[in-house]
Amino acid sequence: MDRQNEQTTGRLWFREHVNKSSSEVLELKKIISEEKNIIAKINQCIEKASDDLLKLVGASDGLQTSQRRLRNIRHFSNTLFNIMRGGIFDNHYDIEKLDFSDYIKRSNKKVFSKKKDLINNLPEIFDIKKLRFLCENDDDKNFIRLCYEYLPLKFSRRHGDPSRPWNKFNIKVNDGDSVLYYHEGNWRDIFQNWEGLVISYPKSLPSIISKFLNATTKDGYNPYRINKEGIDWEVVDEDDTWSHIGYWNDHQIIYLLKLLEGQWQIDRSFILDSLNKKIFSTANVPYKIRDDEEILKDPKNTIDFDHALHQKIMNDVKKIGTDARLVLDQDQVVHVSMAEKLLVLQLSKLSNFIPDGGIWLNTQRPEWNDANNALVGYGVSMVTLYYLNRHISFINKVLAGVNETEFEISNEVLAWFRETKETYKKYSPSVNERLDATKRKTFVQELQKLFSNYRMKTYNKSSSGGDKIKVIEIINFNNLVLAHFENSINNNYLESLYSAYNTINIDNSNKINVTSLYSMLEGQVSVLSSGKVEPKNAVKVLNALFKSDMYQKEQNSFMLYPRKGLKRFLEKNIIPEEIVNESNLFKALLKRNNTDIIYKDSSGKYRFNDSLINSNYLKAELDKLSKTEELKQIMIDEKSEILRHYMTVFDHQNYTGRSGTMYGYEGIGSIYWHMVSKLLLATQELYFKAIQMNEDTDTLRNLGNLYYKIRSGLSSDKTPEQYGAFPYDPYSHTPYKRGAQQPGMTGQVKEEIITRMGELGCVINNGELIFNPKLLKISEFLTESSTFSYVDVNQSMCKLDLNQNQLAFTYCQVPIVYELSDAGQSISVSYAKNKIENINGDSLSKEMSENLFSRSGKIKEIKVCFERSHFLF
């Protein structure tokens, strides 16, 4: 770092650089000391950097002009942070041959050798349309797969808080003077940012969906990290206490579903054509989930790291390329159909279904909220079940439109599917029936056994061959599952709100009992997104949420959970005296002054020995005592009772983790702004669903008012004093009675980008772009003339004069002007060749929409006129 006074202004300049060699630092010092016009050059550099940043944000439609200036700034900020996490394309959908060639070579050396001439004959710059043409006219499945999932993204920085010791990541943003195409991110982060990106780059959706599916595992989970070169996973280090492995659940389903839904709205052919194409790979993550008996015995410790397999893969990467991280058969990547990939993802969740509870968290990781880390093992997620309900309903809609009557899938998957289907059929519930705890246990055991059998067959070996599954079989099974889910959802509607998580008790009995936890914001968000709550009922849920203990009046927003008081230290670990008096073991130990398990403190309270930090330690001590001759019979009679008393005193199974004990981050009293934005999006989706259902105006107004009530709690509607930070910057969370914390790199930005485009009424249906800003506030239209600055499809900074009663934004870098008019709704499309086409109605044709989505440059500007009566708010 260096500094210098600017004599003419009295300003003090600080110059900071990173990643410089000694010679580069010396050269820089020389320039600073010898250059006469150094300040002018610095100003030029700042101006260029600002222009470059504007162009990056503008290329992702981050520039808007409306009467709400702070909202415009917030949209800019959201867009900036979204592309910083997920990256952005360099020039629309253009691909550099040099980077593409290097990508193929790094991925699979054999494929590169085979396709070298084809690649060399490509133009230096070509677009994604050319790449897709290569896919459709080639018979090499490896090349097709690699082409489909290629993403030439730049500017991506992996999300991760560096203060957390387990977060290890690279930040690669330049490569000398050339563009560096690179992306890296946690699976659970980067795909959600790509969901925001594809609004501006819809033609990239097939690549992102392919990258998602190609990286899922045989047992239906996903690796920890994604980067340009493929996948990566956490490696167990026996000497590192932070070293840990596992799989998340909910992210997988809802992130993939949103991408599939987006593709279905834009162009259904990719999904329909891919369902029976064997062009998708499988990640070979060296994690082995234990068998069903081990999981039932200890659901907190269920995954082993295969060190030998990991080392073999690392060695094979040097020989084969990064494709060696995929499932291979004799050094060849094994390919399956999209139908199989989707079926395995679904079956892995359905195999962990616990009726009336949700999806079992038995893969050593929590879900979206890391602070619920202690739910792992005995926690059950209704959140994932709600999302899975929407996912399965969507899959059935897709299957209803396919031409094929059957798909080809692996023998092992087909057997797993059919046996699982029969098990679900055997336990088909009556309407609103809550399953008996004994029957629930046998249902769960059977599902676990089937999943375990499948895993043990497929770990360390490729499929034994292919078989056929009828489409109608899948549809019928999905309908059966949805009936099970409907019961569980209805049974988790408690006191006007829905459960997010439950806990189970499976220790040493033939029953599985389900216990409800306290309400969480996450539960309301996911159920409102599930497709099971109709718009009118959603109004009731949202009103109940505003009346609940989760609502924090000072911030006009919602905490993750109701704020609760904690027991004081001395109030914990107290065994009721009546239990002690009824226990022969407790009385015998106290009489002998044996404090290994129980002792009486100076205040006369009975407590468990402080060293018994969990039930496993207690079991070990009880086992020792059972070897004592005089206590042997007592132990036989009372061991299970003592364990039950221990669990009653400490209630470990209902302990959620940091969320129940800490006050910062995602802890007690904390508002997590990402979840509030998810609530905003769920409410907006229900508003548009109400429009599709032709709901009455009162329902629309109620949902819209609730939407804006939620919106008013977010930062762009607050003062710095209220927010505790700059309102136009996204922040992670706000602890109770404090200001916003952790700026910038939050997943919240994706939801805010999507909801902003929803407010503007940009909706796609079957390939046609519709303009229906029924949710937009009429106060957003300008009250006086202004200028809209934007980046056009030629990457040029442009200005557009706006009048009173207008506003402007871009869509795929084409400026869209909305105008209030008395002449009815109409659309005027201005083409680059000075042709103007007028449309009566609210939508563009498929051809026009395709020109926008493909960023062809044919459309120069679109103007849409609305009557004031169109707007409700």
Functional labels for PLM-detected ranges:
Residues M1-F873:
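Acidic, mature catalytic/reactive cores of soluble proteins
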